[in-house]
From Swiss-Prot:
Residues 1-24, 40-78 are annotated as: Disordered. SUPFAM superfamilies: FMN-linked oxidoreductases. InterPro entries: Aldolase_TIM, DUS-like_FMN-bd, tRNA_hU_synthase_CS. The gene is DUS3. GO terms for biological process: mRNA processing. It is found in: Cytoplasm; Nucleus. The keyword Transcription regulation does not apply. CDD domains: DUS_like_FMN. This is tRNA-dihydrouridine(47) synthase [NAD(P)(+)].
Amino acid sequence: MTAGEKRTSEALDQPESKKVHVERGMAAIKPEFIVQKDRIVDSFDDDEAEGGERGVEEGKSGKGGKKKRRGQNKNRDLKQKREEIRLCTSLLDPDNIKTCAYGPEQCRSTHNVEEYLASKPVDIEGICPVFRAIGYCPAGLKCRWLQSHYDKETRKLIKDLGRTEASKIELNYEVNNVSHEARGKLRKKQYDFAIAGKVIEYIDSTVQNDENIANAKEQRKNNEATYVDAPYKIAEKKRLDFRNAKIVSPLTTVGNLPYRRLMKKLGADITYSEMALSVPLLQATNAEWALPKAHRTEYPGYGVQIATSKHWAAAKVAEIISRETEHVSELNLNCGCPIDLLYRQGQGSALLEQPARLVRILKAMNASSGDIPVTVKIRTGSKENKNTAKTLVERLLAENDVAAITLHGRSRQQRYTKEADWNYIAEVGQVVQQWNDKKEENKDSRDTQRTCFVGNGDVFSHVDWYNAVNTDGIDSVMVARGALIKPWIFEEVEAQQYLDKTATERLDILKTFSDYALEHWGTDEYGVGLARRFMCEFLSFTHRYIPLGILERLPPKINERPPQWKGRNEMETLLGSTDYKDWIKITEMFLGKSGDDFVFTPKHKSNSYEKSN
């Protein structure tokens, strides 16, 4: 299949299922699987997946400078368990003992290996997933599966160097680790922004306030005689082609590295980092610089998404990423996040109301990002029933060299209470297609990169996906909630049919996520706690999948709310449980028994389902 070729799904031509009368907004469950008809499963606020804990640039947003807690359950405890007796990191590997920076007497961690090993809880059964994957375990003596790679007689760690070399060939490693030196210069404000400095100076000189726009034409005439070219040259960009690409949306918290790696294994072509905030990046915050990291298998096809409200910050971040990372395919500007805190700071969807500022930010990014192309994600508008994306896209195409535009078919105000407007997405797609056609006709611009257009919203099956990509003007579809609730959605797209995964197959997917999570966060007590927490976050979406075999009609709709149901076996029922305590039980199948002090409170509450009329 060529890049621009449209594919058709055989499933689209299949006859409709037998009509079943079901109240609007309700999922049609076969009667024998309904447990309690009058009890409706809780709905969820999926906007939190776009904002999550993000949004506090300075770290001070509440009264008294305290950082506000994001999410609807603001009292949830995010602290992870630490060991009561901690082993000094200099002693993790008995074969490679390092010098402790504090010395045995001053160090807060113990230097008594025997005391530490005696204090550890009983090892989790089985083989350490990290040792199995890469031939050694970086957690060393702290590993919760220590017995699988530790010789008690020699008191040394077991290492499989052959497996280590094989893992490198298999591209099983993480990339985009910004050096301590570069982050140190950022922290001390000593980083040399050779390109961004010129870009910022030039854009500052051209800034006009929106209120003076009426005088812009006259002012432009006066400036024609003194016009000066920009003091920088934009580098030639990598080419992007999103036609028919399987794209996973940027997602905060749940869109972490292990999840993205899982999605690549399940057929995704393009993934994005969690949204990174520009100011914390410039402040060299460790937590923020962890976000652009990726697994090697994500590249090519990996984008870093940033949020900002200032062109100077955008320029600097773009230059840092282009200079300090080697595995980034695109830089994506978030103009769709609806979270109030970001909106009040002028970031995310607030930029939809400030097109002049948005244009400046994109210009700054494009001029400072080296060969990395710049893309943007927007919504239909800020207010409900007032679509502005069409006008905005026309301006972006005319004033910027944007490699791709993604449109989420909802306004900021609308959120997830109604279905995405794919008719409007198609309208905007026509604008982009006409723009590309004009460029093709113009011999001077024929060789320049075409602008890709991607739709986003409510895609939950191969039928939804093909309905979208078979629409003129739409190059591909970005999938968000659909890929969280049903991670194998791209396998359905490739097979062009529904895949009714069994409980065992779904457990295999969770097992893979668990292994990837441990490789990323580590197999010590702290890493296992993080893996468990993020697995619970993942389960807060996957439990919403309703097995096809218990539905009375197809296609399934992502916004439909089911009555309380039971599965075809006990495991399927457990995987569909809305009780977070059951989610913790599921994690224990892969991560061992959780401690009594482990608490997980779901971040998402109600609202994402369309209210029935």
